[in-house]
């Protein structure tokens, strides 16, 4: 999991250097997200289905590339991240009291 996160952060940093653009949507190329405990939404390009994130799931990043929290959860910036109002911040989903 840590390796995946480090890889994802690398992708995010490279995306910052260039504008985020989506390829043409080809639903037949989308993978099945499998069982999604908190339901599904569309990916950052509004093409493929992805799972909403629950407690402890990664969220945020440019165009929410790391995920979107399910209803009742908020994306809280990871320790060490800068301005929490920056839409490119990576965080984890935390239940809203």
Curated annotation (Swiss-Prot):
Residues 1-19 form the signal peptide. Disulfide bonds join 22-45, 25-47, 30-48, 36-51, 59-75, 69-93. Expressed in hemocytes. The keyword Glycoprotein applies. InterPro entries: Growth_fac_rcpt_cys_sf, IGFBP-like, IGFBP_rP_mac25. SMART domains: IB. Glycans are attached at residue 21. One of its GO terms (cellular component) is extracellular region. It is found in: Secreted. The keyword Cytoplasm does not apply. Keywords: Disulfide bond, Glycoprotein, Immunity, Innate immunity, Secreted, Signal. Does not reveal bactericidal activities against E.coli and S.aureus. Has a role in the innate immune system. This is Single insulin-like growth factor-binding domain protein-1. It comes from Cupiennius salei (American wandering spider).
